[in-house]
């Protein structure tokens, strides 16, 4: 149970962590179910990064603050952070906690993430940094969830066409400026 708490703390709400501790098969055996997946990506990293010059520690700290800001709405909605990829994130709703309104929850979570970015911008602009934006792609469909990877390194993940579609939607945000 402690290993599960250590693995998922910070990636899932306490409610989700407790459910996984009570049902470890949800991790190891996996599941196939309808989920809502969201990819989010920071916009404006280059100007932000350049504003730090050689201060890598400062940039690392501000990026961690950004990730904290966009993660909290996910945890508040009982979603689960699947992974961080550079300045992007991927999270899922309706797994492992059932949410019959998960498409709506995912969209509301995305809006809450945008509000969190606005508050984050208030802070960094006051410090003389350029503001950033966030694009998001949300899709609902079938997902295959579970512990995946090699024996040397593995993590909880979600796979499926619905995941690829959410990623493509997020990439279109760049093209259409949303």
Label the predicted regions:
Residues 40, 73-105, 119-163, 173:
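Catalytic core of nucleotidyl cyclases, primarily class III adenylyl/guanylyl cyclases
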Residues 26-108:
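Catalytic NTP-binding/metal-coordinating core of nucleotidyl cyclase/transferase enzymes
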